[in-house]
From Swiss-Prot:
The keyword Translocase does not apply. GO terms for cellular component: periplasmic space. This is Uncharacterized protein HI_0045. Residues 1-20 form the signal peptide. Disulfide bonds: none annotated. Its main location: periplasm. It is found in: Periplasm. It holds the Pfam family YtfJ_HI0045. Keywords: Periplasm, Signal. NCBIfam families: ytfJ_HI0045 (TIGR01626).
């Protein structure tokens, strides 16, 4: 009996990794709105926040980078972001959307996360940057805490690729090939 209980407990603990995202290929992302903070937009040299919703993702091919407000999460897929920048995709057909989960930041670093998000928008004005202070996106999409996710959407908003955690070199090539094909 003890072995059965131990097996059950271990099964529950180790199967938690299978409780990952609820995103499905060829489907739209689950609807979500971020009303507190939200999308960072430029207003002259300043930045302002406006409400954002996932319905805004349709219309362009996108790489959506959702990440916890932690340095480790940002660094996990920085090589993917660097390759995207170097690819110089047509901004009429393509846009990167970065969603930063400020609710999933190390205690006491919230202001740094917010300021970093604003700076990121100023440095990449053509990108869409969203600051989520309530984990709304993470919860709606079932994403892991303390992590990074890369999602490729076609111009209708359908998921073409999704992976949580660090992308391999092969994953990065897959993403770039997908975006190239979808933007032709």
């Amino acid at each position: 009996m003890k072995k059965q209980i131990l097996a059950l407990v271990c099964g529950v603990i180790f199967s938690s990794s299978t409780w990952a995202h609820n995103l499905q290929l060829e489907q739209s992302l689950p609807s979500v709105k971020v009303s507190e903070y939200g999308e960072i937009v430029l207003s002259g040299k300043d930045t302002v926040f406006q409400p954002w919703g996932s319905a805004e993702l349709a219309g362009k091919v996108r790489v959506v980078h959702h990440l916890a407000g932690r340095t480790a999460a940002k660094e996990x897929n920085q090589s993917m972001i660097d390759v995207i920048k170097a690819s110089h995709f047509n901004p009429v057909k393509y846009q990167t959307t970065t969603i930063i989960n400020a609710d999933d930041a190390i205690v006491g670093t919230g202001m740094f996360v917010k300021n970093g998000a604003k700076k990121g928008k100023q440095e990449n004005p053509h990108s869409q940057v969203v600051l989520d202070d309530k984990s709304a996106v993470k919860n709606a999409w079932g994403l892991n805490s303390k992590d990074s996710a890369i999602i490729v959407l076609d111009k209708t908003g359908k998921v073409k690729f999704v992976k949580e955690g660090k992308l391999s070199d092969s994953d990065i090539q897959t993403v770039i090939s997908l975006v190239n094909g979808l933007t032709k």
